[in-house]
Curated annotation (Swiss-Prot):
Belongs to the CBF/MAK21 family. This is Nucleolar complex protein 3 homolog. May be required for adipogenesis. Residues 79-93, 174-190 have a biased composition (Acidic residues). Its main location: nucleus. Transmembrane segments: none annotated. It comes from Mus musculus (Mouse). GO terms for biological process: fat cell differentiation. Residues 52-78 have a biased composition (Basic and acidic residues). Residues 40-51 have a biased composition (Basic residues). It comes from the Eukaryota. Residues 449-489 form a coiled coil. Keywords: Coiled coil, Isopeptide bond, Nucleus, Ubl conjugation.
Amino acid sequence: MKARRNKKQVPSFRKLIKTSKVKLENKLKNKQFKQQSTIKKYRKEQRKLRQAVKDAVSKKPIPLEDPKSKRPVKRMEREEDEEEEALPLDMMDEDDLQLMKDLGQKASFLTRDLSSSEPVHIKKRKHESVIEKYEKVPRTLQTAPEKELIHLLPIKDKSGIIPQAREKPVTDVQQEEEAEEELEDEEEVIEDPRKELTIEEHVIERKKKLQDKKIQIAALASAILSDPESHIKKLKELRSMLMEQDPDVAVTVRKLVIISLMELFKDITPSYKIRPLTEAEKSTKIRKETQKLREFEEGLVSQYKFYLENLEQIVKDWKQRKLKKSNVVSLKAYKGLAEVAVKSLCELLVALPHFNFHNNIIVLIVPLMNDGSKPVSEMCCEAVKKLFKQDKLGQASLGVIKVISGFVKGRNYEVRPEMLKTFLCLRIKEVEVKKDTEDINKPKRFMTFKEKRKTLSRMQRKWKKAEEKLERELREAEASESTEKKLKLHTETLNIVFVTYFRILKKAQKSPLLPAVLEGLAKFAHLINVEFFDDLLVVLHTLIESGELSYQESLHCVQTAFHILSGQGDVLNIDPMKFYTHLYKTLFTLHAGATNDGIEIVLHCLDVMLSKRRKQVSHQRALAFIKRLCTLALQVLPNSSIGLLATTRILMHTFPRTDLLLDNESQGSGVFLPELEEPEYCNAQNTALWELHTLRRHYHPIVRRFAAHLLAGAPSEGSEALKPELSRRSAVELFETYSMAAMTFNPPVESSHSKRKDKFLPGDSFLNEDLNQLIKRYCNEAAPETPLDFAKCLESSSRQYRVNGLS
């Protein structure tokens, strides 16, 4: 019978040399375990070595006896007794006796060889002699003072580990006191020349120090800008100068460093957010260039974080009126330092909205918008406005709006109105316009498979598929920002804004924030949901009727109401007559004796109420408003008169039948009632615009030009037509152009150069010769010096008066 053949295949050479992953891992673990055990052994040896050295130092050596000195009698007797009790030498073996002699000569009382280079727990070999090690230990008299050993890092060579130590002499108290006295003397010597410096020398020395610091800052900044990846560590060196301790230049140097670091971060920061690396990314092998980039990003983020923490600490110390222990910077100078820190934070808020820690900057800036210091508050508000204006996507704006809304609610609506006025700079309106255009121009629709099968051949379908694929890829490449994401962010932002506005309308109607709220509602009213229109109009009318609002606040209410009605509110059946009546009766509140700040709001309201709602405005209402605007133009400042006359011109073009106000003939429908508060029933058709004749003699040339133009019927052509720079501008633009807020007259007043010259007669001024002679005689004569006697003159005059009375 055949022997059974082994079916196992002989392993190949490749399999023999191949090592499994488990084996490799086990090998690695064993290697690490051995290294750890070796380290533990080494630490144990070092611990024992230090303990042995301490024991050897702490033992007090017995001083050697002088053979010449006489020993005391008692000690001699005790030694004799010990000798008697000791084992006699004749009873010991020769080997033991020889060993005792050797031990006595070789000083075997030490247990360890301190000078040996071998480890403590080294294995003993047979050929080594234990006694020979102890001979290496020196025996010296301790006549010198005790010295403490400082243990250093050991050295390892072929023979083993060599411990290293250094002696530290024990200093006495007297030596320490002498050293302190020497230091004090040196300090006094150093301080003496400083006190002797004059003011001029002190200023020169400060300039020199400051110049050196400026050169150092410039050198570091230039090195970082030249190659940020290689010199990222110099950011730390530059940031360390924020802790300048020299009181002469501390404030200036810190300000320069803050500004320099801010500009550096704006220049070298990448245009993306740096995220922390995962464990898997850290463990993978990468190229040198990638590793260098990672190190740069990590260093940049860490230094940027520390820089922001330093700025936050400066602002916090200033707010809490704290000073550092060193007292290098005074409290007065700390305010300027804090303002520079706030300015840097504002710059970073605007310049780096995409980078790390942007939300942290927002949390720092928003409370400072409500700060008691006006420069700081204005600086922060301007930075937030700038961020809103340039934020295209809306991510940064949403973060700021969330923090502001929470801050206003947390302060119970007791904040500066400027905080809410920043909402007016949001770019939500522009996105809505883009959305409308995208709805009109819908994207191209691709053909379905069934449509392709019906109309195209097999080859055409293949080409069509490839073409559609390319079009999709091109569309994805061109779309840099997602419109859907943009609309989503702006919708969320708008919801938070309206929630803040409605809270203030509901809970804080007497708050100084109300004008800002009404102004914001007027701007974003077209974006409010239609469901809230009725309730919002009722609230606005209630606020107007309450009488607690100022004139400008009531105008904001009117403007908001008509913005609501001019947008989606066209579909609602709401009669805004009460708002027309309120504006008509309050127009005469404006006059030249007060500031004309409300004129701009009035011009906006008239544009929304009359020009844009021309189909809903009756003929009688248009006539009444034109008559009242011309009357108002007589009692306001020139720029306000120009704006009102420009609005009158637009209304005369919008409502052509209003030219009957230029005739002096009246109709038989009644008498004009100028004091009536209802514009519909004041019979404005029975009056004329006599105010224009008065305005033709106004001292301002532009007012005169507009008055003449309106009297001629506001023609578009001819001699009475306006110039293009006047006719093409809106009423608000003309009001701002000819404003005299800068205390300058526009157009400038021409200096009068009269051609007539005053003629003087040669010789005497008077033609009468007798009069000239009399004047010369009295001018040449010297006046007699007579004393003044008022009593005598009074008696003579009274006596003369009596005589005249009797006669």
